[in-house]
Regions:
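Short, Lys/Arg-enriched, disordered terminal segments
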Residues: 1-3, 105-106
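N-terminal helix-turn-helix DNA-binding core of bacterial DNA-binding proteins
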Residues: 2-44
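Glycine-centered, phosphate/nucleic-acid-interacting loop/turn motifs that mediate DNA/RNA or nucleotide
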Residues: 54
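Basic, amphipathic "hinge/linker" alpha-helix immediately C-terminal to the N-terminal HTH DNA-binding motif
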Residues: 63-86
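Alpha-helical DNA-recognition elements
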Residues: 45, 49
Length: 106
């Protein structure tokens, strides 16, 4: 997938994943990787930025498999931002699909 296209949709995918349940970083990388080829070096800076922008809150939870894990929780403003991105994504999809259909690509 084109890098710029991937970056554009990655925020929405991460926000939707964490809305379903709080996740720690590596768990989120594994979940997002099911639909987009990403690695930790892509996800962690995004998580930091979204946390700084108050879309996520973080908390530590003990782990039976090592040190405590830093979990991400979607805030109310994060939910609003996610819905805004979802609307933009739907609008973009509809526009692109309409354009392609008009030009013989169905």
């Amino acid at each position: 997938m084109n890098v710029q296209l991937k970056k554009g949709i990655l925020e929405l995918i991460v926000l939707v994943a964490v809305r379903e349940k709080d996740m720690y970083g590596y768990e989120l990388v594994a979940e997002v990787s099911k639909v987009v080829d990403v690695n930790e070096g892509t996800i962690y800076p995004l998580l930091k930025r979204l946390t700084n922008e108050k879309y996520f809150e973080t908390y530590l939870r003990e782990s039976t498999e090592g040190p405590p894990r830093n979990y991400y929780h979607l805030t109310a403003s994060g939910i609003l931002y996610m819905e805004e991105l979802r609307g933009e994504w739907t609008e973009l999809q509809d526009g692109v699909n309409s354009f392609l259909k008009e030009h013989g690509y169905e």
